[in-house]
Swiss-Prot record:
GO terms for molecular function: ATP binding; transferase activity. This is SUMO-conjugating enzyme UBC9. Accepts the ubiquitin-like proteins SUMO1, SUMO2 and SUMO3 from the UBLE1A-UBLE1B E1 complex and catalyzes their covalent attachment to other proteins with the help of an E3 ligase such as RANBP2, CBX4 and ZNF451. Can catalyze the formation of poly-SUMO chains. Essential for nuclear architecture and chromosome segregation. Necessary for sumoylation of FOXL2 and KAT5. Sumoylates p53/TP53 at 'Lys-386'. Mediates sumoylation of ERCC6 which is essential for its transcription-coupled nucleotide excision repair activity. GO terms for cellular component: cytoplasm; nucleus. The lineage of its organism: Eukaryota, Metazoa, Chordata, Craniata, Vertebrata.
Amino acid sequence: MSGIALSRLAQERKAWRKDHPFGFVAVPTKNPDGTMNLMNWECAIPGKKGTPWEGGLFKLRMLFKDDYPSSPPKCKFEPPLFHPNVYPSGTVCLSILEEDKDWRPAITINQLFIGIQELLNEPNIQEPAQAEAYTIYCQNRVEYEKRFRAQAKKFCPS
């Protein structure tokens, strides 16, 4: 593992614990020996207030490569979401998560979460990742909103 990646992730964790957006969760996983694994985080993003996603808490895994922050983390909803910019595998399709597009090493975990939360409510129809969600979003917005309201209810924290 890269010392640069681990150092940056330790800084990110410290900053996150000190100050993060209300309702968001980001916790490094544990290795089998009980030590913290900074390369694999279990996260959750709340649905934005005043949107059909409100009330939902959407679980996301962030996986960091050894060359982080030169390369972005992989962000994957678990379980996958019905959304035009979420691949059927759960992987998020967002330009700031793509090395050859808008990723910059200065982007923080906090900024990634805000970007993903915005994407939930405002899909980018220029970059669809899921055909069914994209088609319904474009052709029948009422049905689309009904489906993701149901999804938000399904992912309500207990």
